[in-house]
């Protein structure tokens, strides 16, 4: 009976082939008609080439070229010392190399392959059909491939690419993308690394639980620092606002006092001038009247003296009243003008203070690299003002701000500031 089967080679198998007319594969009994020494064996090297006459063990041309080498299968070749080639077309070319499987190739010293058409180079291990590894690599799985040195590919079609030395690809179709790396997928196939313990050293991986704790800790610290910075900023802003308001009030009061002093001086001057003018006018009129009366009285006879005196008294009285009335009217007019000017001055001072309060309500930008737009209102007594402004914080230490306030009519106030902190 003839059957196709897979065969494992060992010292026990070799002994069985010499000592028994029977061999077993997959628990089926196989009969050998003979076991013969190949004519290709070197008689001086004590090498045995197994070429059983039974078809189940392969065909002809098995070749073992060195001592302790074994070749089993049609065209199997074991080229170096202690090399083993098992399977049709299998090749073991290196010292201590092992090639098991049809068309498998162990192409360097200590290379090991297991699987159809698998290939391993020096010190490499390839397990699985069509598995391939370069020097000092390990490829496990169908069509797994290691093209870099000292690397490992485990899984169906897993691949360590050229120049990706010292890398590992684990899992179906996993691929590496750099040196000294471990890949468990590829660009379009990502996998999770589960049941990972928390890292303890700087070079350990971090699991999600550790990451969450660090994020929470960082958030707490960030909130604490933000609160501290905000408190400092608010305190600074409050102090500066109070200082600015106090300065504005002081300046307004100084301006008001100056204006009042000027108004008083002007009023006194006008009143003095008016009084002097009235007095001069009255004296002049009185002198003219008296002169006329004297002339008139002198021209009359003495019997008309009493009449002249009476007439003179009446005339002088009327002239004096007229002069006083004109003087009072002029003085009243000047004082009304002064009152109007003072009222306008009070209004302008109130509007100025309202504008200053509105400008002081504008916020300074806090975020670095941020531009803000802010608006505010202010009032003083019966006056109100609207202010708008904008600012920009260049960095943590430098900020710019400008604003404009409008209190009605043509009353506009503006300011601009530059802030440096250290």
Swiss-Prot record:
GO terms for biological process: cell adhesion; protein transport. Keywords: Cell adhesion, Cell outer membrane, Coiled coil, Membrane, Plasmid, Protein transport, Signal, Transmembrane, Transmembrane beta strand, Transport, Virulence. The chain crosses the membrane at residues 369-379, 383-394, 401-407, 411-422. Gene3D superfamilies: GSPII I/J protein-like (3.30.1300.30), Serralysin-like metalloprotease, C-terminal (2.150.10.10). GO terms for molecular function: collagen binding. Residues 331-368 are annotated as: Outer membrane translocation of the passenger domain. Residues 1-25 form the signal peptide. It holds the Pfam family YadA_anchor. InterPro entries: Adhesin_Head_dom, Coiled_stalk_dom, OM_adhesion_Yersinia, Pilin-like, Serralysin-like_metalloprot_C, YadA_C. It is found in: Cell surface; Cell outer membrane. Residues 26-330 are annotated as: Surface exposed passenger domain. Residues 206-236 form a coiled coil. GO terms for cellular component: cell outer membrane; cell surface. Homotrimer; trimers are very stable, not disrupted by heating at 95 degrees Celsius for 10 minutes in SDS sample buffer. Collagen-binding outer membrane protein forming a fibrillar matrix on the bacterial cell surface and phagocytosis resistance. Promotes initial attachment and invasion of eukaryotic cells. Also protects the bacteria by being responsible for agglutination, serum resistance and complement inactivation. Gly-389 plays an important role in this protein; replacing it with increasingly large polar residues decreases expression levels and trimer stability. Belongs to the autotransporter-2 (AT-2) (TC 1.B.40) family. Expression of mutant proteins in E.coli is improved in a degP deletion, suggesting the mutants are susceptible to degradation in the periplasm. The signal peptide, cleaved at the inner membrane, guides the autotransporter protein to the periplasmic space. Then, insertion of the trimerized C-terminal translocator domain in the outer membrane forms a hydrophilic pore for the translocation of the passenger domain to the bacterial cell surface. The passenger domain is probably exported as a hairpin structure, with all 3 strands of the trimer in the pore simultaneously. This is Adhesin YadA. It comes from Yersinia enterocolitica serotype O:8 / biotype 1B (strain NCTC 13174 / 8081). The gene is yadA.
